[in-house]
Amino acid sequence: MNRPGMNAVVIAALVVALAVTPVFAGNFMVSLLNDIGIGTLVALGLVLLTGIGGATSFGQAAFVGIAAYASAWLSTAHGVSPWLGLPFALSLTGLSALAIGMLTLRLGGHFLPLSTIAWGLSIAMLFGNMDALGRHTGLSNIPPLFIGSWSLASPQSIYYLIWTLVGLAYLFSYNLLRSRPGRAIRSLRGGAILLASVGADAYRVRLTLFVTAALLAGLAGWLYAHMNRFVSPSPFDVRASIEYLLMAVAGGLGHLAGALVGSALVLILKNSLQDVLPLLTQRAGQLEAIAFAALFILLLHFARGGLMGFVRKWMQRWAGPPLARAPMARVAPLAHRTLPARGTPILSVSGAVKRFGGLVAVDDVSFDVNAGEIVGLIGPNGAGKSTMFNLLTCTASMTAGQVRFLGQNITGMAQREVARLGLARTFQHVKLRPQMSLLDNVALGAHSRTQVGFLKAGLRLDVHEERQMLQEAQRQLDRIGLGDRAHELAGSLPLGTQRILEIARALAADPVLLVLDEPAAGLRRKEKMALGQLLRKLCDEGVTILIVEHDMDFVMKLVDRLVVMNFGSKLLEGVPVSYTHLRAHETKANLVCRLLLE
């Protein structure tokens, strides 16, 4: 059986099992499944945020508590219906997450997880010290949910609501990851520079994802309050947050299904320990914490992919060959830019200077790039090529001078804004997402050409725009000769093919200027020949190209014009000539040639 067929069978079996369980199971089992469903909602947000987005949170239980307390307080103190309390609870949770995220998500390294512990502790302490929330005693006699006259006070009656919401949350998350914002989410681990190169704002994507994960936790908190009809600070402290994170890790941080698997594993284990440990010792609570800590450490050492990692390997082993995919339905193409007439200046660098303290990396460099040509920026190691490249793409700030693109001064602009203007780039060290298909990697390049957001994507209201982006990605793959490998993983490609794939991603942005950072680095002779043929073909099709390179053989056969740098300065600019001609004249050009050959 092929993998899609296996997935369909597993999902159908799970839905049937969940549907009939309350008919045969007792109150304890149904209550446990309710807890698993609520835990799944929180863990699902953590899979998106931490596993896929790469932002670790040790404070997710605080968002569960904000929504739980908000709805509980409204319904007990003011008699507001829980259904009216839901939008209030989610709004308060979302605004809290927005404020916290704006303060903390720019932190890097271990500072972000530490900050989540800090605000998680603070919010839990706030719950325990507010008179309106009952301080450490909490709020009791919270009204149950009603659908018309039908009370959802019993475990069996609220069961179907919980699991319906879990199913909808899964569907939303699945749709989200298979969309324009989903590709940006899956690329967050590639770094902010990668997303900026396609016109996306990594901080904004991460912040929106942070709020989305908090809203899933808030939905779980609302259900928790009206299912248990009692709230107190202890279920929302940092220890509970670590438990939710353990659910995501145990199930598999990279898999949506891992949230359900991990929640079931952790809560079943927790209930088992609570039954067994009191029979063995009077310090059952301490041993339970030690047991979960040991499980966490073992998972990080031996099963970082979680249980779903093992399941995926098993499915890959036993699934049959993938089915041939039906061709996509044709839709109207994405809007294209009108390219400047051949020979029109599109990039102008004037007096560029970059200093790092007392070191002058780029010293008063000026040159132009005209439409329809291939320009090579060359020089020996340490000449300042990479620094110049970073100044052109606005990855680094300029000490003095100016860069104009299409007549507009882009000096000091954000890289993502320059990318949206039509300046696309590749990287010296390939930046592809290895676990994404070739098609998705290239579709990421078209990110700035549509405006689909999280909500529209999650509700699957982006079908037309998504087809347009995938159609454009397929067109670019066909253009570079990889169209028949669209659904392979990018990580399975050799280096030379990965570099060509990066060019396809840049082309998907419909650029006016394509800037390549040492595209021939690490390539074998035949791969360089193939790359050169591709670039010349693209130039003939109207693409303007600037190549930053130190491989003279590759550049001299390809470019229309050369700009030569050494020690941060421009030494020579003009039409390339043969090595023999350069060596025949004792001029500055001869000196440059010998420098490059050393």
Segments the model singles out, each with a brief description of its role:
Residues 453-485, 512, 533-536:
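Conserved ABC ATPase "signature" region
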Residues 580-587:
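Conserved small/polar residues in nucleotide/adenosyl-binding loops
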